[in-house]
């Protein structure tokens, strides 16, 4: 059985990953909500722009970030697991949309890694009995 300091460090790492996934999603929501015409300025967003406006994407990202915040604030393991799965899935969707728009962008890999981290975190949490 792992020692108490190891379990505490492992819990802190899981919370840090969860917080990072939430913060990146919230940051993307804020960037798209600002009146900067992000979709116009970057060809990497053209697939997202074809699907919905910046404001709609900002609302969707903020909703997902809110689910992440709820998961961070609760002690319920099922809610935490569910929120991480929602965050990881949205990061994966964003990675896929960037890949469709511009495969050479670094955003594809960045959001893909974040999605993988989220799914790893979900696996660890479910493996430990949520």
Sequence positions of predicted segments:
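Hydrophobic residues within the alpha-helical transmembrane core of Major Facilitator Superfamily
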Residues: 26, 62, 69, 92, ...
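Non-cytosolic membrane-interface motifs at loop->transmembrane helix junctions
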Residues: 45-49, 104-113
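Juxtamembrane helix-break-helix junctions at the cytosolic face
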Residues: 66-80
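Membrane-helix boundary connector in multi-pass membrane proteins
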Residues: 76-79, 85-110, 127-130
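Short, Lys/Arg-rich, polar N-terminal cytosolic tail immediately upstream
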Residues: 1-10
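Hydrophobic alpha-helical transmembrane segments of polytopic
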Residues: 14-24, 57-60, 64, 80-90, ...
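Hydrophobic transmembrane helix segments
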Residues: 15-59
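Membrane-water interface at the C-terminal end of transmembrane alpha helices
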Residues: 115-130
